[in-house]
Amino acid sequence: NLPEKAGVATTSPDAVDKMLDFVKKEIEKIDLIEHVDIETSFVGAGSVYATLGKLARRSTHYSLDIENNYILEAPVFEKVYSVVKDLGLDKTKKLKGISEDSVDTLLCGISIAKAVSDVLNIERMSISGDTLREGLIYSYIAMEANEKPFSDMLGYSLENIRIFKDQKYSNTAHVYNLAVILFKQLKVIHKLSRVYVKALRIAASMYDSGKRICFDNHEKYSFNVILNSPLNGVSHKDVLLAAFTCVCQNPDNLNLSDWVKYKDILTEEDMEAVKKMGVIIKLADQLDKSRRGNVTDICCDILGDSVILKTVVKGNADFEIMEGMKLGPTFKKIFKKYLEII
C-alpha cells in the first residue's frame, strides 16, 4: 500500500507529492538505474499508463483515439500529472471515460509513473495497448519460435490478421508482393522516401479489408478496419497513412474534410504520398484480377512521358493487362505520365 508506506493518510496534492518523493528514493536505490542508456526507448504498459494516455489525448485534443503506440511527451505528462494531483480522489472519479477501478489506482500509479520519469529523465515514451497478459503470451511464442525479440512486429501483426480474417480464395499475399515490386520499380517517379514503407505494407496487406463490411466502395470501409486493427511496431501516423492509402485506391474518394481532422498528425506532403501509394496498390490489384497469380514479376521502363510495365507471367495474363490498363487515366492524373503494360 503506497500511501501507507509513504506515511500519508489522504489523497491531497501534498500527499501525492510525498508519495512521489518516497517512490523516487526507492527507485534511486536500484543499482540498475545507473546503467540505463540515455538512448533507451521507454514503453509504459498497464492500466495506469493506459489512463494517462487517454487523459493526455484529451488534454491535447489529439485527433486519433488509439491507445497502442501513443507517444506521451514529457510536457504533456507533466500537465496531466498536475491536473490529476490537484483534483484529488473524489473529483478524479468524475473524469469521463475513466473506469472506477482505474480511478482507485490512478493517484498512486501516476505518482510511480512520474517518479520513474523524473529519475530516468524520460522525455517521451510509448504507451502500450498490451498488458502483462499479452507480454507473457508473446514471451511464450518467442520461446517456441526461438526468436527473441521479434524481428518484425508489424509483419507478425499483418500475418495474424491475414490468417484470421482472409477468405479461402484471398489473393492478399500476391497483391502485397506486386505492390512492393511496383513501389520499388516506380521510385523514380513517385519519389517517396522509406518513411512510407510501413504504411504501404499495411495498406497492401489490408487493401480489400473493407469488403468484410460492404463490397461496394470497399476502399472507404477499409479505412476504419485499418484504424481499428491490432497493429504493432508502427506509429499512429503510419496507421493513418495506410488507412488513407486504401481510400486512395480511387483518389476521388479522398475527402478533404476527412483529411483535415488529422492535421495534427498528417501533412500536405503526406496527402500526395497516399494518393501515389493508393494508385500503386490498385494497379497491383488489377494485375491479379483473376486471382490466379498469373503476373509473377514486373520490370519498369520510364521513357519520357510514358511508363512501360513489362510483366513476367506464368500463363495467359491478357485479362490482367487489360484490367491494369483501365487505370491509365488515374495513373496519368497522379504521376503525370502515360501508362503502358505489356
Kindly give the residue locations of the regions a language model identified.
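A short amphipathic beta-strand at an alpha->beta junction
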Residues: F335-I342
